[in-house]
């Protein structure tokens, strides 16, 4: 399970990176194997298992992190802070900050929680966010600049809510046309 989560995060981190000149940002230190080893050796089994769990936003609160060392939060379709479908960006950002604070307050490894949001065609869980066509329609435009601009707009709106990980835009090529999430893919052309 842990390997699958790492693989998913790895693939998501490369979303939309092909043929794009990303500015180099030095905000994160290069991985230090000794540091990673030290952190892992200091973690309990409960903390290690917790890092593989991604709880749905509807079923977890910042106070739950005092007891459960959860590694991540997902807000998929129709989830929002405290069930408020019209929550402001400030409410989203406040909740993200609360989760961060509680995840680093527990003691032990103090690994900040990851929050991933489903923003396949915009940050649609946020009231007033810009909604874009699904990827299958965007792929049909064959307009790389448009796709980059949409990706930038979605990233800006997601960051405005204090969330740093989005499950979009995806770079997928349809292999099996029977797959039910075909609309989230671009094109095979």
Language model regions located:
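Sec-dependent N-terminal signal peptides
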Residues: 4-13
């Amino acid at each position: 399970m842990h390997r699958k989560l790492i693989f998913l995060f790895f693939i998501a981190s490369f979303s939309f990176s092909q043929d794009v000149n990303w500015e180099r940002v030095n905000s994160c230190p290069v991985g230090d194997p000794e540091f990673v080893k030290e952190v892992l050796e200091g973690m309990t089994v409960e903390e290690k298992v917790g890092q593989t769990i991604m709880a749905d936003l509807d079923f977890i609160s910042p106070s739950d992190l005092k007891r459960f060392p959860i590694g991540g939060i997902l807000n998929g379709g129709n989830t929002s802070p405290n069930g408020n479908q019209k929550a402001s960006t400030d409410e989203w950002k406040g909740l993200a900050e609360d989760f961060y604070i509680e995840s680093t307050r527990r003691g032990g490894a103090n690994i900040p929680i990851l929050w991933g949001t489903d923003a396949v065609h915009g940050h649609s869980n946020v009231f007033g966010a810009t909604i874009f066509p699904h990827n299958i329609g965007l792929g049909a435009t064959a307009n790389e600049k448009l796709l980059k601009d949409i990706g930038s707009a979605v990233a800006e709106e997601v960051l405005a809510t204090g969330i740093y990980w989005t499950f979009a835009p995806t770079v997928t090529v349809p292999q099996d046309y029977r797959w039910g999430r075909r609309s989230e893919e671009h094109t095979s052309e």
